[in-house]
Each structure stands twice: as structure tokens, then as C-alpha cells.
């Protein structure tokens, strides 16, 4: 029998959170918040495709509230999570649900989130694997593998020459090692998304330097 390996007790019992299930609420909040960070703007419409277990229990376990809360930028312990749908409505964000109770999704707690406004659309697939832990498996049709258990920097920027060099130079100045980097773009010269996993949890000074780089729209750091 294969043994399961956990990095900490929180992989088993989950984080401090609002809601009954770390998989269906805490993980869902984290997925939504990651998608919000990648999008980097106020959305006008968000479509949630829910598969298998997510689809069957999304209302009873509060997965719907958790996903929307994440899109609104809330954390797992935010007391406003039960009101997230109301808050989204007040902000003029249209929420659409696509329920797929039976599918061939590789994990039962899978969602594909499509976020739109007048300028752009992105699509992200994420899974909640337990204890509030998540994996991001697809971004705009590109297969990626991010577990978000390591410190991660998400940068939205204009697709211009030298951007990768500017960012890596900023990290190098503070002796921050890059473990993995994924870069995708809408098309040449348009907005691009850079997702960087690093070995250090102390990146605040480097992040401030990165924010000063021209043609950069949004930077978020997840410890």
C-alpha cells in the first residue's frame, strides 16, 4: 500500500475556516482567490463548472459561497463568506453555475472557473485535494501543475521583451531561488500571466521591487 505523505498537520485537519469541510469550503475559497489574482481585474461575469462531488454537494457544503468568496478576494476565515453571493450581486458580478454531476474529471472536487469582463477572459481549472490544499491543473487551455503549497508569485503584465529578465533579476537580488515558472499570454503584445514558485517565504522586499517594473498590472504573493 502506498503511504500518504503530509507536510504538516494542517494537510490533515485543514486551516482555520468558515464552513463544514476543508475540501469543499477552504479549498474552494483558495481556488477562487487564486483565479481572482490571476485575472487581476474586477470581473463582470464568473462561470463555475462544478464536477462530480463538487457538483453534488456545492450548496449543502457551501462550496458555492466559498468559490465566490475567493473570487471576491476573501480568505478562508473571512466572516463575510456566507454573504458572498449577495456581495457579488451588489458589485454587479454575474454568477453562472454549470453543474456536471457525472463526468470524467480526474478528481471529484474539480472546478473550471471562467472569468470575464469587457477586456478579457481567462479559464482556470483547480481541484481541492483535502485539508484546504489545492492544485491548479489548467490555465487558458495550457496544462500546468501548481499545488500552491510552496510560496508562489503570480504576476499579470504586458507581454513586452525583457519582462522575464526584469523579474528574475529582482528575485536574484534577494537570493530568492525559482523552483518553477509558468508563463502564458493571450497573444503577442497583450497581457501575459507569470506564475513563479520560489523557495523562500520572505519575498516582500523583492515583491516591492517587482511592483516597480514597467508594464506590470498586478502582483500577488501566496506564502
Go through each PLM region and give its residues.
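Acidic-glycine-rich active-site phosphate/pyrophosphate-binding loop
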Residues: 1-9, 40-44
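Gly-rich Lys/Arg/Thr-decorated short loops/hinges at beta-loop-alpha junctions or inter-strand turns
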Residues: 9-13, 146-149
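Conserved phosphate/anionic-ligand binding catalytic regions in large, soluble enzymes, centered on
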Residues: 14-32
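Histidine-anchored nucleotide/phosphate-binding helix
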Residues: 32-38
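A structural-propensity feature for long, helix-poor, extended segments
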Residues: 47, 51-90
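Short glycine/threonine-rich loop-to-helix capping motif typified by GTGT followed
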Residues: 57-65, 110, 191-197
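Contiguous domain-boundary segments centered on the initiation and propagation of an alpha-helix
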Residues: 72-118
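A conserved regulatory-domain signal marking ACT and ACT-like small-molecule sensing domains
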Residues: 95-97, 104, 121-223
Amino acid at each position: 500500500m502506498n503511504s500518504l505523505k503530509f507536510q504538516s498537520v494542517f494537510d490533515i485537519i485543514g486551516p482555520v475556516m468558515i464552513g463544514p469541510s476543508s475540501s469543499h469550503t477552504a479549498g474552494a475559497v483558495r481556488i477562487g482567490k487564486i483565479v481572482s489574482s490571476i485575472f487581476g481585474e474586477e470581473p463582470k461575469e464568473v462561470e463555475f463548472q462544478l464536477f462530480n462531488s463538487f457538483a453534488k454537494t456545492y450548496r449543502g457544503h457551501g462550496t458555492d459561497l466559498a468559490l465566490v468568496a475567493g473570487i471576491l478576494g476573501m480568505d478562508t476565515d473571512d466572516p463575510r463568506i456566507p454573504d458572498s453571493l449577495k456581495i457579488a450581486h451588489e458589485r454587479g458580478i454575474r454568477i453562472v453555475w454549470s453543474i456536471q454531476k457525472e463526468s470524467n474529471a480526474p478528481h471529484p472536487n474539480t472546478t473550471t472557473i471562467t472569468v470575464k469582463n469587457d477586456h478579457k477572459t481567462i479559464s482556470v481549472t483547480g481541484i481541492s485535494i483535502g485539508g484546504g490544499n489545492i492544485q491548479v491543473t489548467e490555465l487558458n487551455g495550457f496544462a500546468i501543475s501548481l499545488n500552491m503549497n510552496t510560496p508562489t508569485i503570480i504576476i499579470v503584465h504586458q507581454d513586452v521583451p525583457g519582462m522575464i529578465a526584469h523579474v528574475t533579476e529582482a528575485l536574484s537580488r534577494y537570493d530568492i531561488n525559482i523552483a518553477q515558472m509558468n508563463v502564458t499570454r493571450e497573444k503577442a503584445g497583450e497581457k501575459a500571466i507569470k506564475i513563479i514558485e520560489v523557495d523562500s517565504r520572505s519575498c516582500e522586499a523583492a515583491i516591492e521591487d517587482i511592483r516597480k517594473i514597467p508594464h506590470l498590472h498586478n502582483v500577488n504573493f501566496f506564502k
